[in-house]
Amino acid sequence: MAKKSSVEKNNRRKRMAKNAAPKRARLKAIIADKTKPMEERFAATLKLAEMPRNSSATRIRNRCELTGRPRSNYRKNKLSRIALRELGSKGLVPGLVKSSW
């Protein structure tokens, strides 16, 4: 089980990234637009740099919804390999069948 503070920190980052996504996209579009004057593009770069680091989508970590484990997660199920195995062996994951031969 992951620390509650780590899980909450990640949830806070998700919220910040979601709220700041339109503004970041607007600034990045201005920076990438070569037809804009250099001063305007530089000002947009400074504004983007002033934004909080945690508002960037790259700071978000995929975590297990059940345990909060940060590594070895399946995106489709949003579960770690350990939680997926436990739920799968109990028959709680639809379509997942334990192989035997």
UniProtKB/Swiss-Prot annotation:
Offer an example of a GO molecular function term for this protein.
structural constituent of ribosome
What Pfam family does this protein match (any one)? Answer: Ribosomal_S14
- For whether the record's keyword set contains Ribosomal protein, the answer is yes
InterPro entries from the entry?
A: Ribosomal_uS14, Ribosomal_uS14_bac/plastid
Segment Disordered: which positions? 1-23
Q: Where is the composition biased (Basic residues)?
A: 11-23
Protein name, entry field: Small ribosomal subunit protein uS14
GO BP annotation list: translation
Question: What is the recorded function of this protein according to its Swiss-Prot or TrEMBL entry?
Answer: Binds 16S rRNA, required for the assembly of 30S particles and may also be responsible for determining the conformation of the 16S rRNA at the A site.
Identify the keywords attached in UniProt to this record, alphabetized: Ribonucleoprotein, Ribosomal protein, RNA-binding, rRNA-binding
Specify the taxonomic lineage.
Bacteria, Pseudomonadati, Pseudomonadota, Alphaproteobacteria, Hyphomicrobiales
Q: Which HAMAP family match?
A: Ribosomal_uS14_1
Which SUPFAM superfamilies does this one have?
Answer: Glucocorticoid receptor-like (DNA-binding domain)
User: One Gene Ontology cellular component annotation?
Assistant: cytoplasm
Q: Which organism is it from?
A: Bradyrhizobium sp. (strain BTAi1 / ATCC BAA-1182)
- The regions listed as transmembrane in this protein's record are none
